[in-house]
Amino acid sequence: NSNAGTLLLFDVNNIRYVSATKIGEWERDKMCRFCLLTGDDSPYVWDFGSAAEHHKRHSDWLEPSHCLAGVVGMRGTIPPEFGLMQKYAKQIAQLIKDAGMADMPVGVDYAETAMFHALQEEGLNVVDGQQIMLAAREIKNTDEIQLLTQAAAMVDGVYHMIYEELKPGIRENDIVALSNKMLYEMGSDDVEAINAISGERCNPHPHNFTDRLIRPGDQAFFDILQSYQGYRTCYYRTFNVGRATPSQNDAYVKAREWIDASIAMIKPGVSTDKVAEVWPTAESLGFANEDQAFGLQFGHGLGLALHERPIISRAVSMDHPMEIQTGMVFALETYCPATDGYSAARIEEEVVVTETGCEVISLFPAEDLPIANRY
């Protein structure tokens, strides 16, 4: 639905989506590859040195002459005055002209500032290409849903391991290490992050892990962010260690009620503001405004990126609702602080939107508060 004739992509997720190519995960934040899709032509990929020859030999869905070596700025480590940005901006502009797209906008997802300037100096009308790509990636096909389901199944297994290992004497970082090991052994291509939060660290939510020792009676929650064949998980579970207090259990029950209420709302045609409405306000949880509570009661698309569309939050959805559609895959997450002032419960479910509702694909049991190594 865009009016762009060309897409120039530096985001590794967009490059993968358009060209079906990927090199090592180390590339993610380097801005060392780029891809051009112009008119009806097949994609061009400028790769990191010899990776171009590798893709030429092994990526038979690409035109061999479109597998090129090239680099621009690598996040500024190659200064603009070296001239590489101008060199490739000229090459890109010529390819766009050859494809008959010179008079149409060029969607760029993101690039270094100097690269934007170089493209504009070549007379290109640069527009926001990230919105075009995110719209294209909103609806998942059958293969994508299968990969997302497989990724979630891997995390099911990790949570069973955590349920067995979570006991006094083990540290948050030990759980992170064990989880990384298990995921890579199962075939994960990237463990993006694992949050491990326990005891007094549960409130406020710090979004990290430390070397804190687990103690009897701790409430602890974890988030596992990893990908299988590029497709990602965001999947929280809360446990108690040995036993739970009434305050901790009450927090869990509320978090479960909130997430169940949001899952019940999911079906094609429902707008995201209606989902966000069933969650508590920031003020009811002790925050001054929704910005301070952002991400605690939250929904976000899953795919090649951790955060895709739709985004569901009281901070944005009430004024800017989006329509839920069949084929979307997203995570719903809730958070409830306990009345003891430091414990908290966090639950997250991944759902696939079907023609009549949704299917939950995060299957480690979470209907009731799991007690690990019960006394």
What does each model-identified segment do?
Residues N1-Y375:
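Active-site neighborhoods and metal-handling regions in enzymes and metal-associated proteins
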